[in-house]
Amino acid sequence: MSILQKLENSAAAAVKALYGTDPMEGQIQLQKTKREFKGHLTLVVFPFVKMSRKSPEATATEIGEWLLANESAVSAIEVVKGFLNLTIAPRVWLELLNEIRADINFGHKVATEDSPLVMVEYSSPNTNKPLHLGHVRNNLLGYSLSEIMKANGYRVVKTNIVNDRGIHICKSMLAWQKWGDGVTPEKAGKKGDHLIGDFYVLFDKHYKAELNSLMAEGKSKEEAEAASTLMAEAREMLRLWEAGDEKVVDLWRTMNQWVYDGFDATYKMMGVDFDKIYYESETYLVGKEEVLRGLEEGLFVKHSDGSVWADLTKDGLDEKLLLRADGTSVYMTQDIGTAKMRFNDYPINRMIYVVGNEQNYHFQVLSILLDRLGFEFGKGLVHFSYGMVELPEGKMKSREGTVVDADDLMDEMIRTAAEIAAEAGKAAEMDEEESREVARIVGLGSLKYFILKVDPRKNMTFNPKESIDFNGNTGSFVQYTYARIRSLMRRAEAAGYDIPSQLPTDLPLSEKEEALIQKVSEYAEVVSEAGHSYSPALIANYIYDLVKEYNQFYHDFSVLKEEDERIRAFRLALSEVVALTMRKGFALLGIEMPERM
């Protein structure tokens, strides 16, 4: 039982003993005491004033005196208006530190075969271009959320839906046919996803030129788009693909495999993975079957042009297209099919979609349509909606070829980390291989931390230069502190200093040492809240606060030079626990820790 839970129970017992009634749920409010006051935890007394029929100050004093007499964990009290500040006895903090050290899974719950199963969808790339900065935020959020849910005791299936079919894929295929001259990734000397992305950009370049030519002849933009032969060819290629044309399907398979090979390399570098990958080419037919079933059952309507729609006006929305007039499907069709397949494949208790906030309407509609089709799971879908990410230069547009590729960004971060380390002389004692590995860990860690420390629901600007800074709220600052603690522990081991498995509980502690133990003990609560609110940012910012407190402690107190053997062992044990907590927290963010920097 945590100190917080223990004192919540004792406060409830105090209210019952003093005022003859049990407090209602939520009335016991314990929070961390503000720095300007004495104490560790503060009880809000206002909810009990009606019971006591006394002033807030008198009520706080009564409850505080009862706790002093009946709860040995409380060593002192201070009343400030309607707030009761409680000081916890040093013995309790040392007992807690021993408990944390003994529990290798502290802060994490271990799933069993009976634990609820959560499926988390993230990444969802198109096979017509490489992953870009927007995908980086998506992948990092999805992976981190999955790890956080695991730490909260859930069984987790990480899944990816690859958008491997559709008009956008046909644009790249058509451009390769027309202007590719048989080029392959090997011939071009580049990753397959980048090569296919080049042809997507090339299609758009020729398409715009065609539109400009048609508009120069006097056509409006709409008329030019309708008259475009290039777009007509792309649509015909899509029709042939859906009809199973052998040549088109063979080309599609070949070019998609080039892209998959490229994606795999990017995912490996990024440090994300998946338990199950679905492909739109396999799920959209299931979706079409469901839409046609809904049409037969009168759930949907067919317009005069042959297109199929869902009328959502009774749900406060508008009409939603489900099948085009030519019978081809849309994203919604595929998502219906994918959802059905997933719930057939796994006993899912919660389905979480990690998708940007521009798709809020889409998932609102998907939930309604699945429910209308008779799937009970439709009501329980969770859209983890996150904000857009940009660079200081502005927005990214893949059609114009100005997108920031994930591969290029990661390479730049690793190079920058290596350069900064070299300038600071931090890599002087390392050989070339270790220097490269540390640069990789720090560069990617800085990228991940900078993105994940931001509230996922907010838009953000990623600044590569700001993200690698050995001071301030950055991943590299945390990693440097971790490496310093590991160096401290190696020196302690070399000096033969022993740390007993159980520390004595009669040691004198300073306020800063108590506060640091308290901060470590909050890890479990933060992990729980991060899972409840789907927020990796809570983990990131907690670790940063922990690091700040540790650095202040390290600045103010001797560790290796402490002459009192028992105090030295305590401070080493505390340092070790802080480092372990940092590593566990960063692992939930997908960030590695270097042993040296």
Curated annotation (Swiss-Prot):
The keyword 4Fe-4S does not apply. Belongs to the class-I aminoacyl-tRNA synthetase family. A motif ('HIGH' region) lies at residues 125-135. Its EC number is 6.1.1.19. SUPFAM superfamilies: Anticodon-binding domain of a subclass of class I aminoacyl-tRNA synthetases, Arginyl-tRNA synthetase (ArgRS), N-terminal 'additional' domain, Nucleotidylyl transferase. It catalyses: tRNA(Arg) + L-arginine + ATP = L-arginyl-tRNA(Arg) + AMP + diphosphate. GO terms for biological process: arginyl-tRNA aminoacylation. This is Arginine--tRNA ligase. It comes from Porphyromonas gingivalis (strain ATCC BAA-308 / W83). Disulfide bonds: none annotated. Keywords: Aminoacyl-tRNA synthetase, ATP-binding, Cytoplasm, Ligase, Nucleotide-binding, Protein biosynthesis. Monomer. GO terms for molecular function: arginine-tRNA ligase activity; ATP binding. One of its GO terms (cellular component) is cytoplasm. InterPro entries: aa-tRNA-synth_I_CS (IPR001412), Arg-tRNA-ligase (IPR001278), Arg-tRNA-synth_N (IPR005148), Arg-tRNA-synth_N_sf (IPR036695), ArgRS_core (IPR035684), DALR_anticod-bd (IPR008909), Rossmann-like_a/b/a_fold (IPR014729), tRNAsynth_Ia_anticodon-bd (IPR009080). The gene is argS. Its main location: cytoplasm. It comes from the Bacteria. It is found in: Cytoplasm. PANTHER family: ARGININE--TRNA LIGASE, CYTOPLASMIC, ARGINYL-TRNA SYNTHETASE.
